[in-house]
A protein has these predicted regions:
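Catalytic histidine-centered segment of alpha/beta-hydrolase-like enzymes
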Residues: 243-252, 256
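Conserved small/polar residues in nucleotide/adenosyl-binding loops
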Residues: 262-269
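Flexible "cap/lid" loop of the alpha/beta hydrolase fold
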Residues: 104-146
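Conserved alpha/beta-hydrolase catalytic His-Asp/Glu region
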Residues: 134-204
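Short beta-strand/loop motif that positions the catalytic acidic residue
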Residues: 205, 211-213
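Acidic catalytic loop of the alpha/beta-hydrolase fold
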Residues: 216-220
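Active-site glycine-rich loops that stabilize anionic/oxyanionic intermediates
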Residues: 31-34
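Active-site loop/oxyanion-hole signature of alpha/beta-hydrolase fold enzymes
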Residues: 8, 13, 40-48, 52-98, ...
Length: 271
């Protein structure tokens, strides 16, 4: 689905169903350098169960036009504008990695628009390894390889993708390298490295929140995810064992089950 946000063409996957602004809306926000493609299983599941879904491509990513936004604050404000751009008044948000910072900022800037929040592989701060940041800003493909290596747990390195013929590490690499690396991954990494407001923002959140953490996450470590959850009033925590940072791909079924039965229950009771 294509629509305009601030006059710029924006793409979002609707999970294979026509978008209906009268249904409860869930917006999925991808991580650094990625796109709507990482949410294929999640969007389809909810789209066929009574929800309207938008797995957005942030500006300059995937099939969205424009330049990549340079700060987490800008990205959060942009996600808030998406809600009105599609004719809705409120939404639930699901973010992964950098998308956690973005969705928290969206809640902070647009609290009246957000019903519930799901954070996958999140932390209150995501400082970047200087060498990885340098490689990404130089468009060196090694940055993508390193990110995918660190993002997956041990099991994710040995196959097991739910789609026959696909390999976990290659899926992310294909998405990132669809664009100039420095213009997406480089910009996103720099935005994460510069963002310092996470703890203060998290402490002010007051809405149903679920944190899904990978026990073997090497990018946003388990202990950092727990610290973030502790900052958020009433946050629920689900830990997925034998899983790294890319739980939405590595353990898609467990992740989906957790979101559907734990978190969106709160969404439904508020309707």
């Amino acid at each position: 689905m294509k629509f305009k946000v601030r006059g710029i063409d924006t793409f979002a996957s609707t999970g294979g169903r026509p978008f209906d602004k009268n249904k409860p809306l869930i917006i999925f926000v991808h991580g650094s350098g990625l796109s709507h493609m990482v949410w294929v299983l999640q969007t389809r599941y909810f789209a066929f169960r009574g929800y309207s879904v938008l797995a957005v491509d942030l500006p300059g990513h995937g099939l969205s036009s424009g330049e990549s936004l340079k700060t987490i604050e800008e990205m959060g404000n942009w996600v808030g504008d998406v809600i009105g751009a599609v004719g809705c008044k409120e939404a639930s948000l699901v973010g992964h990695s950098q998308g956690c910072l973005v969705t928290m900022e969206c809640v902070a800037q647009h609290p009246e628009k957000i019903k519930t929040l799901t954070l996958m592989g999140g932390a209150s701060a995501i400082p970047m390894n200087p060498e990885l940041l340098r490689l990404a800003e130089e468009s060196n493909p090694k940055a993508v390889d390193l990110m995918m290596d660190f993002a997956h747990g041990p099991a994710g390195h040995f196959g097991g993708h739910p789609v026959p013929g696909l390999y976990h590490l290659n899926v992310g690499s294909m998405i990132v390298q669809n664009k100039e690396i420095k213009d997406t991954l480089g910009v996103d990494f720099r935005a994460c490295d510069n963002y310092k407001n996470g703890p203060e923002v998290a402490k002010k959140l007051d809405l149903p929140t679920l944190s899904i953490l990978g026990a073997q996450d090497r990018m946003c470590r388990l202990k950092d995810g727990k610290i973030l959850a502790d900052y958020i009033k009433g946050s629920e925590v689900k830990i997925i064992e034998d899983c790294g940072h890319m739980m939405l791909l590595e353990e898609a079924d467990q992740t989906l089950e957790t979101v559907s039965y734990t978190h969106l229950r709160a969404h439904e009771t508020q309707q």
